[in-house]
Amino acid sequence: MLKLSNENKKFIKVILDGFFRIYLAEFFSKFKPKKYKAFSKYSIVCPIYNVEKYLEDFFESIIKQRLDFKNNIFIICVDDGSTDNSAKIIKKYQKKYPKNITYLYKANGGLSSARNYGLKFVKTHWLCFTDPDDFLNRDYFYEVDKNIKRYNNEN
C-alpha cells in the first residue's frame, strides 16, 4: 500500500473538497424556487451619488429577484451630480434593460432631493426606496408581493 505524506494528504483533501462543493452546488441548484407570477408591479427610487463600487452588485441583486424582474420591477436611478463612473454603469444596465431602468440626472441637492425628484416618475402603485449599497435578498419582492396579495384579498 502506498503511504502518502502530509502534503499529499492535504492536496488530495483540497481537491476532493472542491469537487464535492461544486457537485453539491450543482445538485442543489435544481431545487431553487421557480419564478413567481406577480400580483402587482413595483418601482424602486434610488438616489445615486458617487457609488460606482456598489452599483454592479446592487443591480444584480434586483435583476436576480425570484419575482420576474423584466415584467414587474422598475428602477428609477436619480444621479444627484455624481463625479465618478456611476452614470456609465447605470447606462450600461439601462441599455440592457431599457423597459426597467430609468436614468435621471439632477444637480447635487442631497438624498431627499433626489428621492423626491424620482417620485415624479413613478407609475406603479407600489414603491420602495433603496440605496445603491443595499443588496436585496433574492426573495425580497416575492415576499412583499405575496403579502400584498394575501392582505389585499382580505379586504
Where are the language model's segments positioned?
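A conserved acidic beta->alpha catalytic loop
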Residues: 61, 78-88, 131
